[in-house]
C-alpha cells in the first residue's frame, strides 16, 4: 500500500471511526509498525484512544461488582467497564483473539459507539482475525511489504478533519453510486452485506474530505480500494461477449454526437467492471494462488484465531479450590474462603474503623473459587479413502473397525464419525455417534471407486473435528489412505495441485492442534504420506494389510495417547 492510500485510510478512520468500524492492520512487530502505531496515537480522534489487553475478561469489558471495595465498605460497590464510554480500542496480537472475545467485540462494534484497531501479527496463512470482528472493520492496511514509513507525513490536517465532520451529514449518495458498489461486490465474490455498507460509508467520508457534498465516481473507486481489496475473491470470469457492430451514423449526426460526448463527465457513471478492476489492482501478487485456499481453511477452522480455548462438555469430580477472581460462571468456595480469612481477623480489626468488631472482615485475596475437572467426550473421525481398485477391501476394513470401536465406546464415552472420499469430493456418512444401530445402517452399501480427492477428505475431517471441538469434545483424526491423491478441491483432475492443497490442509490441521493418525494402506510405505504426516504432526502407521481388529487396536491406542 502506497503512501497516499495509507494517508487516505487514516483520514477516513479519523473523521468517523465508529461509522467505518475500525482498521485491520496486518504487520509483524517491528520499527515499521511502531512508527505506524505512533502515528495512530497522534490522530485527532473524536473519542478516546485506549489499549485493549488481548486477555481482557468480561469484568473489565462490562464492569460489575467490585469485590475488594464491596468487602471493604460492607455494601455493594459497582465498577465501570471499558465499554462504558465510546473509545477507539487498539487490540494487540489480534490473530490470537478468541471466539469468545471476538463475539463481545462484534456486539460492541454493532452499537456504532466504538471502533477497533486490530494489530494482526499473523505469521502463517491459517492464522487469522476472527471473522466476526474482521467483517466489521471497514479499513484494511497491510504493511508486510513496506520498508519505510513517513509517520508525520501520514497525519491529516486537523482543519480538514473538522471541516469533513461538518460536511458529512450533508453528503448525498446518488442511487447509481450504490448500484456500482453492490454490483462490484457481487462480481468480486463478496457475500457479506456489511462490505458494501462500509464501502459506501467510506465513500461519503472521502467526499467530505474533498470538500464536496455529492459522492462522485472517483470517491467510489477510492473507497473500494480501501475497503474491499482484502475481502475480494479472484474469480475466474468468462470474457464478456463482443459488443454488436455500431450502426452507421445518420448524416449530420456525427457533430451533434461529438458535442454531447464532450459535455458528459467521464466519471459521472462507471461500469461495475471498473470498480472490480480497481479493487483487483490492490490485491497482493500471490492472492490468486493463496486467497481461495486461505478462505477455505479459515472457514474450516472457524476463523477463531490462534488462541481458541478448549473446554470440556461434561463436569467431572471436584478439585481443590484455588484463589481466584469472580468472573463468568466462577463459584465461591465459602468454606475455603472463610478458612483463608480467619487467621487475619485480629490484625484486620485493629486496622479497621470502629464498629466492625463483630463483622467478619474478608478481602479479595481470601476468595477461593470452586473447581471441577473438565471431562470431554472423545471422538475418532475416520477419513477413509474409498477410491480405486482396492476401495471395497478398505471400506470393509473401515466398517469393521468402526463397529469394533463402537462396541468399546459405551464404557469410555467415545464417539466415532465416518467420512469417505472418492470421485471428486468427500462426504460425511456418519456424524459423531455412539449408536450401533444407526452406524450399521449407515455403513451398509458404501460406494467405492473413482478418483482420490485426498485434500477434500482431509478438509472435511478438519471441519468435522472443529465442530466436535466447539461442542466440548476431544477429536482425533484418522486418515486411512494410500496417499495417491489426484483430485483438487475444485473437483478437477490435477495430481500436482491436489498434492499442494493436501499439504496446505495438513498445515492447517497442525496449526489447530488437532491430534491425527495417518494409516498407510499401500502395499509398500508411501514416502509422500510420511512427509504429509510430518507436516500434519501426525502419527504415521504403515498397515498394508490392515484388518479390522488391527486397525481398531491401533486407533484405540491413538485415542488413549
From Swiss-Prot:
Catalytic activity of the protein: protoporphyrin IX + Mg(2+) + ATP + H2O = Mg-protoporphyrin IX + ADP + phosphate + 3 H(+)
Residue stretches making up the VWFA domain: 379-559
Ranges of Basic residues composition bias in the record: 314-323
Annotated segments matching region Disordered: 234-268, 298-324
BP term (GO), one: photosynthesis
Pathway noted in the entry: Porphyrin-containing compound metabolism; bacteriochlorophyll biosynthesis
Pfam families for the chain: AAA_lid_2, VWA_2
Alphabetic keyword roster: ATP-binding, Bacteriochlorophyll biosynthesis, Chlorophyll biosynthesis, Ligase, Nucleotide-binding, Photosynthesis
SMART domains with a match to the protein in the record: VWA (SM00327)
Stretches with biased composition (Pro residues): 237-249
Recorded GO MF terms: ATP binding; magnesium chelatase activity
Domain of life: Bacteria
Composition skew (Acidic residues), residue ranges: 250-265
Family from the record: Belongs to the Mg-chelatase subunits D/I family.
Protein name, as recorded: Magnesium-chelatase 60 kDa subunit
Organism: Rhodobacter capsulatus (strain ATCC BAA-309 / NBRC 16581 / SB1003)
Gene: bchD
Amino acid at each position: 500500500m502506497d503512501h497516499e492510500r495509507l494517508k487516505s485510510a487514516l483520514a477516513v478512520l479519523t473523521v468517523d471511526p465508529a461509522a467505518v468500524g475500525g482498521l485491520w492492520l496486518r504487520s509483524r512487530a517491528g520499527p515499521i509498525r511502531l512508527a505506524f502505531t505512533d502515528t495512530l496515537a497522534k490522530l485527532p480522534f473524536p473519542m478516546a484512544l485506549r489499549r485493549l489487553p488481548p486477555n481482557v475478561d468480561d469484568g473489565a469489558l462490562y464492569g460489575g461488582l467490585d469485590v475488594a471495595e464491596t468487602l471493604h465498605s460492607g455494601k455493594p460497590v459497582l465498577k465501570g467497564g471499558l465499554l462504558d464510554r465510546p473509545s477507539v480500542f487498539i487490540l494487540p496480537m489480534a490473530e490470537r483473539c478468541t471466539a469468545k472475545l471476538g463475539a463481545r467485540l462484534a456486539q460492541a462494534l454493532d452499537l456504532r459507539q466504538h471502533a477497533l484497531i486490530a494489530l494482526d501479527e499473523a505469521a502463517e496463512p491459517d492464522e487469522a482475525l476472527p471473522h466476526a470482528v474482521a467483517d466489521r472493520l471497514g479499513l484494511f492496511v497491510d504493511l508486510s511489504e513496506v520498508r519505510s514509513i513517513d509517520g508525520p507525513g501520514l497525519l491529516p490536517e486537523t482543519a480538514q478533519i473538522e471541516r469533513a465532520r461538518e460536511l458529512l451529514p450533508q453528503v448525498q449518495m446518488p442511487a447509481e453510486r450504490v448500484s456500482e458498489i453492490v454490483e462490484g461486490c457481487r462480481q468480486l465474490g463478496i457475500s457479506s452485506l456489511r462490505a458494501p455498507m462500509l464501502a459506501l460509508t467510506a465513500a461519503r467520508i472521502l467526499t467530505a474530505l474533498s470538500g464536496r457534498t455529492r459522492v462522485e465516481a472517483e470517491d467510489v473507486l477510492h473507497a473500494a480500494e480501501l475497503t474491499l481489496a482484502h475481502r475480494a475473491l479472484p474469480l475466474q470470469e468468462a470474457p464478456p461477449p463482443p459488443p454488436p457492430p455500431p450502426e452507421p451514423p445518420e448524416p449530420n449526426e456525427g457533430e451533434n454526437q461529438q458535442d454531447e460526448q464532450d459535455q458528459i463527465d467521464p466519471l459521472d457513471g462507471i461500469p461495475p467492471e471498473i470498480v472490480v478492476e480497481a479493487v483487483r489492482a490492490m490485491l497482493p501478487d500471490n492472492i490468486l494462488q493463496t486467497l481461495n485456499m486461505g478462505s477455505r481453511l479459515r472457514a474450516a477452522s472457524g476463523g477463531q484465531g490462534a488462541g481458541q480455548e478448549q473446554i470440556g462438555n461434561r463436569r467431572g469430580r471436584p478439585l481443590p479450590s484455588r484463589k481466584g477472581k469472580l468472573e463468568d460462571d466462577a463459584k465461591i468456595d465459602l468454606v475455603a474462603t472463610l478458612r483463608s480469612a480467619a487467621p487475619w481477623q485480629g490484625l484486620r480489626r485493629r486496622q479497621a474503623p470502629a464498629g466492625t468488631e463483630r463483622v467478619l472482615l474478608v478481602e479479595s485475596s481470601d476468595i477461593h473459587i470452586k473447581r471441577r475437572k473438565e471431562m470431554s467426550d472423545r471422538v475418532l473421525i475416520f477419513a477413509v479413502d474409498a477410491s480405486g481398485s482396492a476401495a471395497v477391501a478398505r471400506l470393509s476394513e473401515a466398517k469393521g473397525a468402526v463397529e469394533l470401536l463402537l462396541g468399546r465406546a459405551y464404557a469410555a464415552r467415545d464417539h466415532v464419525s465416518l467420512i469417505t472420499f472418492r470421485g471428486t469430493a468427500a462426504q460425511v456418512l456418519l456424524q459423531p455417534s455412539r449408536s450401533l444401530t444407526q452406524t450399521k445402517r449407515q455403513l451398509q452399501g458404501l460406494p467405492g471407486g473413482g478418483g482420490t480427492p485426498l485434500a477434500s477428505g482431509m478438509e472435511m475431517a478438519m471441519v468435522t473435528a472443529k465442530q466436535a471441538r466447539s461442542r466440548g469434545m476431544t477429536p482425533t483424526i484418522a486418515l486411512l489412505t494410500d496417499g495417491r491423491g489426484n483430485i483438487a478441491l475444485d473437483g478437477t483432475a490435477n495430481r500436482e495441485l491436489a498434492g499442494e492443497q493436501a499439504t496446505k490442509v495438513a498445515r492447517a490441521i497442525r496449526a489447530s492442534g488437532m491430534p491425527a493418525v495417518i494409516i498407510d494402506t499401500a502395499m509398500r510405505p508411501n514416502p509422500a504420506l510420511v512427509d504429509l504426516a510430518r507436516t500434519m504432526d501426525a502419527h504415521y502407521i504403515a498397515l498394508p494389510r490392515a484388518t479390522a481388529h488391527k486397525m481398531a487396536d491401533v486407533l484405540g491406542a491413538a485415542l488413549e495417547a
